[in-house]
């Protein structure tokens, strides 16, 4: 799709969407996003220029269908996939990608950590993906030195970061906000550092007794990113890993640094979103969202969950979707899904499906709560189909049509039941939706009430349905 769009930009010093937006140029990607979001092109350009919206669109990812992440657009969902040293391969990861896209993932992150040729897996995923692809480059940086922190130097990080850009990665999680002076603040936590990338950087600083190289070389990374239009996803290395650790001094100290880095990236016209927690009690979610907006000048917020309780391994797609819906309502721009396997193992295809549907529900609920134009239209259409007993229309409008039809057909599989005015819950005689109250019914009832003349009945006003 984008081959012709980007051909004229290649070789320019800065090809970022923010750079063009700040020059008053509406790119083809901005125009495409405007149609997808049903928003004016001028608003898209203004939001990208301001930094409140990003369009992750590496110029080397030419089969990408551009999308937007930001407060003015619909709430988005990311799905994580990736091979580990103990499970999966390239073909399985591409299948997970296709499944994630099928069930509505707006972006996908490849979190492969080893066991396969990481470049081969990443290239295959990007080549098959119509949605933006994100990565965490420190994983491959460590793998490139065979897991030896002592052998890992600053240039290794930058080499891998540029390689990912060259391969077409649209956004990269860069753990530049974790500073060496933040590490003592972790001491009082129950779960310490739960970010894999953050853990790698913490080990590096503790071994070398030097500042985080992603922080000290941040401007160099900006120079790389703007040549490819790769977007920062500023990683929250000190995100809380349990309810006890939420909103603590370590998390908030790093968040302040992430705000500073956001403004530094913007000076280079490089797009930024900021990652957030994690594990957060319900009553602290609004605070976390508002604090990020304050510290990071309203750069799009991208949260993992958050999980609102820690006692449900095997069901953390539910514990986190609860928090995700609330985070989206308060202004989070993108939700990173959590699968039932969280804290337990590498998710398989069915786990990807379960996690994604839970998060599409959360994002959609947030859009309704934020009164985004048209957000409830599909709900209303499905409700009309439900009231009319139009089963096939209900399946069609469902987030997961296959699952909806499967559950219906478990007890009433014959085609004739697709015209039935009941399901197996109430049966043919007790479904309340069979009770249809017409205008004629209301007029007749009104006459009866008036004829009885009782004070309490005479005061009843019956409103006809419009």
From Swiss-Prot:
NCBIfam families reported for this sequence: PRK09284.1, PRK13352.1, thiC
EC main group: lyase
Annotated GO MF terms: 4 iron, 4 sulfur cluster binding; carbon-carbon lyase activity; zinc ion binding
Catalytic reaction list: 5-amino-1-(5-phospho-beta-D-ribosyl)imidazole + S-adenosyl-L-methionine = 4-amino-2-methyl-5-(phosphooxymethyl)pyrimidine + CO + 5'-deoxyadenosine + formate + L-methionine + 3 H(+)
Gene name, Swiss-Prot/TrEMBL: thiC
Binding site for substrate: 80, 109, 139, 175, 195-197, 236-239, 275, 302
Required co-factors: [4Fe-4S] cluster
Keywords assigned: 4Fe-4S, Iron, Iron-sulfur, Lyase, Metal-binding, S-adenosyl-L-methionine, Thiamine biosynthesis, Zinc
Species the sequence originates in: Synechococcus sp. (strain CC9902)
Protein's recorded name: Phosphomethylpyrimidine synthase
Reported function: Catalyzes the synthesis of the hydroxymethylpyrimidine phosphate (HMP-P) moiety of thiamine from aminoimidazole ribotide (AIR) in a radical S-adenosyl-L-methionine (SAM)-dependent reaction.
């Amino acid at each position: 799709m984008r081959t012709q769009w980007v051909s004229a930009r290649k070789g320019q010093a800065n090809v970022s969407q923010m750079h063009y937006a700040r020059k008053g140029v509406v790119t083809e990607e901005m125009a495409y996003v405007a149609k997808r979001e049903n928003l004016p092109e001028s608003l898209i350009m203004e939001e990208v220029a301001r930094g409140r919206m990003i369009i992750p669109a590496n110029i080397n990812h030419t089969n990408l269908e551009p999308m937007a992440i930001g407060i003015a657009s619909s709430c988005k969902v990311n799905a994580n996939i990736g091979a580990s040293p103990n499970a999966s391969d390239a073909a399985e990861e591409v299948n997970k990608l296709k499944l994630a896209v099928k069930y509505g993932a707006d972006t996908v992150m490849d979190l492969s950590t080893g066991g396969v040729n990481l470049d081969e897996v990443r290239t295959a995923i990007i080549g098959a993906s119509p949605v933006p692809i994100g990565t965490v480059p420190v994983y491959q940086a460590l793998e490139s030195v065979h897991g030896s922190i002592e052998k890992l130097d600053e240039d290794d990080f930058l080499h891998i970061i540029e390689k990912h850009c060259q391969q077409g990665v649209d956004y990269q999680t860069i753990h530049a906000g974790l500073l060496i002076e933040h590490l003592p603040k972790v001491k009082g936590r129950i779960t310490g550092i739960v970010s894999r990338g953050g853990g790698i950087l913490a080990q590096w600083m503790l071994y070398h007794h030097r500042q985080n190289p992603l922080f000290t070389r941040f401007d160099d990374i900006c120079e790389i990113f703007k040549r490819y239009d790769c977007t920062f996803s500023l990683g929250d290395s000190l995100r809380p890993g349990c309810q006890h650790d939420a909103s603590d001094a370590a998390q908030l100290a790093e968040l302040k640094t992430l705000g500073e880095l956001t403004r530094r990236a913007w000076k280079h016209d490089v797009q930024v979103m900021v990652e957030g927690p994690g594990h957060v009690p319900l009553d602290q979610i609004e605070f976390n969202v508002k604090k990020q907006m304050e510290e990071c000048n309203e750069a799009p917020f991208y949260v993992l969950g958050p999980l609102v309780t820690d006692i449900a391994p095997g069901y953390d797609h539910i514990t986190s979707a609860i928090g995700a819906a609330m985070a989206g309502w308060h202004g989070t721009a993108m939700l990173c899904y959590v699968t039932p396997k969280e804290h337990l193992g590498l998710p398989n295809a069915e786990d990807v499906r379960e996690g994604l549907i839970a998060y599409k529900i959360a994002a959609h609920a947030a859009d309704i709560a934020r009164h985004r134009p048209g957000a409830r239209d599909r709900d209303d259409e499905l409700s009309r189909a439900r009231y009319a007993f139009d089963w096939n229309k209900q399946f069609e409008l469902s987030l997961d049509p296959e699952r909806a039809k499967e559950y219906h057909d478990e007890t009433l599989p014959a085609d004739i039941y697709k015209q039935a005015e009941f399901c197996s819950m109430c049966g043919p005689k007790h479904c309340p939706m069979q009770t249809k109250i017409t205008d004629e019914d209301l007029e007749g009832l009104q006459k009866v009430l008036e004829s009885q003349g009782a004070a309490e009945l005479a005061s009843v006003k019956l409103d006809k349905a419009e």
